[in-house]
């Protein structure tokens, strides 16, 4: 009797780890799709953006960016700041992703908070190829988000309901993300950096001009304090 291929064994091992992620990604993705559709975009916007960007927080923000006047510098800095934590994820995964061959570029591209957490902590069973395990965790997580965003975009055009105030979902999402990170962290290192920089720049530059200075301050602080932040990040997922 032939034994299972390493890829098939890896898929069967990876899938159970992604089931909790499906619950979150699918419904949040649907919310994003509906939000995009009610903001005036066709369903293929969230469908394509969920694959090309694959960053939930950035995709929500991108909706308002697409509706705002063209400001490439602010868009670039905003994107860098929102996704900056991935720099530390990437550094932490250098050894684990070593030797994964052609899969490595996709593993780097598809890394998100949940994928990082699973791939960093999972104990890969014997007989399952390590590279394929990481690949299927990443692929399944992205598929869940893609599926939710696409269905949300389609349903958002079919359903007729009062969407007034739906744009507040983005504000609520960032508040929930901040609170979740605050509760998970013991040191609140990065949270304090963000709070102090935001309040200081708001007072110095005013509500209309504080965003870019805040992002620059946070980026500089996180870069300068990379080693302690990276160490705390690794402790949080162990």
Placement of each model-derived feature along the sequence:
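Alpha-helical transmembrane segments and their membrane-interface exit regions
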Residues: 57, 81-88, 173-179, 198-200, ...
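Helical membrane-embedded segments and adjacent short helical loop/helix-boundary regions
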Residues: 11-28, 41-47, 52-55, 160, ...
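Alpha-helical transmembrane segments of multipass membrane proteins
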Residues: 30-34, 61, 118, 150, ...
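Short, Lys/Arg-rich, polar N-terminal cytosolic tail immediately upstream
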Residues: 1-13
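Helix-loop-helix junctions within the multi-pass membrane cores of secondary transporters/permeases
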Residues: 2-3, 76-167
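Membrane-embedded alpha-helical modules
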Residues: 131-213
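Pore-lining transmembrane helices
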Residues: 13-108, 122, 144
